[in-house]
Amino acid sequence: MMIDFNDYRRVAGDEIVDQIIKEVKPLQGKDVHHVNSTYYGGGVAEILDSLVFLMNKIGINAGWRLIKGSDEFFHVTKLIHDGCQGADISLTPSMIQVYEETIARNANFTHLKNSDAVIAHDPQVLPLITHYKKNQPWVWRCHIDITRPNPALWDFLKNFINKYDEMVVSDKSFIKEDIKIRQSIIMPSIDPLTDKNKEISLSEAEIILGKAGVKFNKPVISQIARFDVWKDPLGVITAYEIAKKETDCQLVLLGNYATDDPGGDEMYRKTVQRAKESEDVTVLVNLENNDLTVNALQRLSKIVIQKSTREGFGLTVSEALWKGTPVIGGKVGGIINQIIDGKNGYLVEDINECAQKIIYLLKDEELRKQMGEFGKQYVKKNFLITRHLLDYIRLLNRVIG
């Protein structure tokens, strides 16, 4: 059954829904286009899937354009992504040519000239603005952790960024002094009515996970994340092994590949090999009912881990908290905004600290319950799609005028 916008009243409350309906009025009938590089496999695609749908539900003519490219193009953009997060990379002239020519080709059929506003998501699509006569405001929405970007790469990207009207990031630590245009903060969100986040019973969750091969003979801890070096799945396994020596448990790693991440397959293979060397570690990938499986796993886990070493936001943190499960997360990027240390989980800086917090939480059921209750209310107040939608409405009202 298709979701109606008023359905959000029962989970987010009347106040914010009424505020959205009030503030969207100047934007009704306006054409707004989002552009990114993938429809599946990452947080950006997941957010856009809900956000674009809801924008249309409340009267904005919102479209979603996808950049198409070769494997070579996505190899280059993965390097750019990693460089933005601080990796020591360098782009050759031929790589830059692939990057810029692919975007130029896409500009021929992306058809944005009649939009009232364009929102370009992440570095993959950044040069697109250079191929249009700018008749409307353009916003660059950067979803990744740019706390300490590779200096040479950042100098290259700034040439494109400064052509935009505004740059939107997910955390105040990502604001850059060397960017001339306006910068603002919009934190991401989860959609509480999707299959991934809707209410399901524990018995339903057990059936779903059972079909995926998960057994319940030992307490479950989990990490749900793309197979990516920045998510540190190998470090999670090591932390789990340390914890398991003191309190018996099992680890489930559930992930997928984003269509714009050619390195995911290699990290998946490394993770599977590392899991084989351990005990009671299950690795699940690209499942048919992935969203429901994530939902079930986050509900039935005693603890969810998000041990990222760089993180733009980390939607899986709020997803797990929404289900009343405490989270142990890396003390980086947007995770810091979601985990209130000691209240709904713990922020950790290394493998040993992660392991000790796993042990501590597994041994204290009452604390896990208290953290879960606090976490759900914290997400309701701060990280639901309704707040996110209102932030975008205010952004668009400001830039369109």
Per-region residue spans from a language model:
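A conserved catalytic-core segment of Leloir-type glycosyltransferases
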Residues: 1-31, 49-114, 186-192
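Conserved donor-binding/catalytic core segment of Leloir-type glycosyltransferases
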Residues: 33, 209-231, 237, 251-252
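Nucleotide-activated donor-binding/catalytic signature segment of Leloir-type glycosyltransferases, i.e.
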Residues: 255, 259, 264-296
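Short alpha-helical segment that forms part of, or immediately flanks, the ligand-binding pocket
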Residues: 295, 318-322, 336-337, 343
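Aromatic "clamp/platform" in nucleotide-sugar-dependent glycosyltransferases that forms part
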Residues: 309
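Short hydrophobic beta-strand element within catalytic cores of glycosyltransferases
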Residues: 326-329
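Conserved acidic donor-binding segment of nucleotide-sugar-dependent glycosyltransferases
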Residues: 341-352, 360-365
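A short, well-ordered alpha-helix in the C-terminal region of glycosyltransferases
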Residues: 360, 367-382, 388-394
